[in-house]
């Protein structure tokens, strides 16, 4: 059936007679074999095995699908809500009709899994090594999660009251609800990670002197960029990141009278 074709082009490569012709140029000359065969996975920054977890979803195996996603990222439901899904832009189904909804499928896998995958998570024996992570945003927590699975003792330091980084303080709750983010952070910490909020180490050297074997700096990019125009530094001209963070903290910046917003994107 035509609808059953994922438009991956694999049949062209393995056909022993050459009878299957690449008439629409599925295989691009300027791409590697991996990029041609599974372009969605190649386009994904985390290189998640997208075809495999979609196959599990189709079979109703949501736990297996979630486990495949968590091989690469510990935030499947968060990504399913806010990912910019570069994979969909490279989906071979674009050549036929429309791309698969990879991002929403990722969220469906995370929302419907039972948590049974936790029983099968492999954790290597304790190494005796201590790792410190500065910043409890998505990068810091992801690193902490996989370091813990490697058997290292991990402590995460976060200067804000709660973990989450830009996911919590830079994205409005209507796009990424706190309950969803809290649930995934809780799952990450269950790997045996210690989280210290409202704590800001002076420097990586300070942590090394305290006995940590290695330090990862994952403080994020919370500083916004002002437009290079006259008056951008005047009082009551606010940068988007500052405004969003203060709003999420419940202390919005003072506004009155007429308000102008420069920029028509999501922010």
Predicted region positions:
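Short amphipathic alpha-helical segments
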Residues: 55, 145-146, 168-169, 227-231
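Glycine-rich beta-alpha-beta "Rossmann" dinucleotide-binding loop(s) and their flanking helix/strand
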Residues: 215-217, 221-244
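Glycine-rich FAD pyrophosphate-binding loop
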Residues: 152-168
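Extreme N-terminal leader/targeting segments of oxidoreductases
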Residues: 93-129, 183, 210, 237-240
């Amino acid at each position: 059936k035509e609808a059953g074709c994922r438009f991956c082009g694999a049949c062209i490569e393995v056909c022993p007679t050459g009878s299957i012709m690449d008439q629409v140029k599925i295989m691009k000359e300027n791409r590697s074999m991996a990029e041609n065969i599974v372009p969605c996975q190649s386009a994904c920054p985390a290189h998640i095995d997208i075809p495999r977890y979609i196959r599990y979803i189709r079979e109703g195996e949501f736990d297996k699908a979630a486990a495949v996603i968590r091989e690469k990222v510990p935030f499947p439901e968060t990504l399913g809500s806010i990912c910019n899904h570069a994979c969909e832009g490279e989906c071979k189904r674009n050549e036929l009709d429309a791309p698969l909804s990879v991002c929403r499928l990722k969220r469906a896998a995370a929302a419907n899994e039972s948590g049974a995958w936790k029983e099968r998570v492999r954790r290597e024996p304790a190494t005796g090594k201590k790792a410190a992570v500065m910043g409890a945003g998505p990068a810091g927590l992801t690193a902490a999660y996989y370091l813990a699975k490697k058997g290292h003792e991990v402590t995460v330091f976060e200067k804000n009251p709660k973990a989450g980084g830009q996911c919590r303080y830079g994205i409005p709750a209507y796009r990424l609800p706190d309950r969803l983010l809290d649930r995934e952070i809780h799952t990450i910490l269950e790997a045996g990670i210690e989280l210290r909020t409202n704590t800001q180490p002076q420097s990586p050297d300070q942590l090394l002197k305290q006995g940590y074997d290695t330090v990862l700096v994952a403080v994020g990019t919370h500083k916004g960029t002002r437009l290079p125009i006259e008056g951008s530094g005047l009082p009551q001209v606010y940068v988007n990141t500052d405004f969003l963070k203060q709003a999420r903290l419940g202390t919005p910046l003072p506004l009155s009278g007429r308000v102008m917003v420069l920029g028509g994107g999501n922010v």
